Amino acid sequence: MSVPDAAVVKAFLLDLQNRICAGLQALDGQARFAADSWTRAEGGGGTSRVLTQGAVFEQAGVNFSHVTGAAMPASATAHRPELAGRSFEAMGVSLVIHPNNPYIPTTHANVRFFIAQKEGADPVWWFGGGFDLTPYYPFEEDVREWHQTSKDICAPFGDEVYPKYKKWCDEYFFLPHRNETRGVGGLFFDDLNQAGFEQSFSFMQAVGNGFLTAYAPIVERRKDTEFGERERQFQLYRRGRYVEFNLVYDRGTLFGLQTGGRTESILMSMPPLVRWQYAYTPEAGSPEADLYDNYLKPRDWV
């Protein structure tokens, strides 16, 4: 396995954060990102960038972090018990975008790199990441295009890559207590190191670089769609699923909280406004029912 180069990964991640923020500002056309740099007592730090109350985006957060620690937290060793007790270095860019218009989907993306070390043993390293889409009023053409772009990103790395990481995304972003997916999926990968550092890093870069290619056309297509209070209330209700998933199941959120990460940055993914409603059921045949009937179970889109 080729030797990992954390400095090269960090340089890419910082540049990716800059480029994604610039792209989102251009899409919004009004609001700007505010940067907030922070340090962590146990080692490392990062920069959170948040755009609020824009013309298109109600809130968009793009976070870079690079943290080190003396012992891997439980969230990171639950499926890798052999790593317990190792020191670690983790870096990544993660983002969540909550649009104003309910016809624009919420989206999340993340790319990350881990190294776990122990004296007298080779370092264990891996890449992870992906992106996923959470529509409120879905359009089939948007979902198919999103998945076609995902497939195109994966294609140079092998025909088996897209179906594998698409399936993993469907399984990961699932709420067992609701028996529904968080959205329409995308890509999710973790523990990526089998092909060696260069190839694994190349795939992580392709996913990070491909995010705006997948998302921007959907924003452009839907940002001027008219909506009213009904659509807004449904958007706020469905945002509740986002909160439920992130606080109950998401490994990244748990990792951040368990490692003494910066709470404001970790919870940047939360929607600025959200509502719950007791025993909500969409009206049969309504646009809201279309989401439940056709988009919250895994499907083959391409």
From Swiss-Prot:
A divalent metal cation binds at residues 98, 108, 147, 177. Keywords: Cytoplasm, Heme biosynthesis, Metal-binding, Oxidoreductase, Porphyrin biosynthesis. The keyword Lipid biosynthesis does not apply. It is an enzyme of class 1 (oxidoreductase). One of its GO terms (molecular function) is protein homodimerization activity. The active site is at residue 108. Substrate binds at residues 94, 110-112, 260-262. Pathway: Porphyrin-containing compound metabolism; protoporphyrin-IX biosynthesis; protoporphyrinogen-IX from coproporphyrinogen-III (O2 route): step 1/1. Its EC number is 1.3.3.3. HAMAP family: Coprogen_oxidas. Homodimer. This is Oxygen-dependent coproporphyrinogen-III oxidase. It comes from Shewanella baltica (strain OS155 / ATCC BAA-1091). The lineage of its organism: Bacteria, Pseudomonadati, Pseudomonadota, Gammaproteobacteria, Alteromonadales.
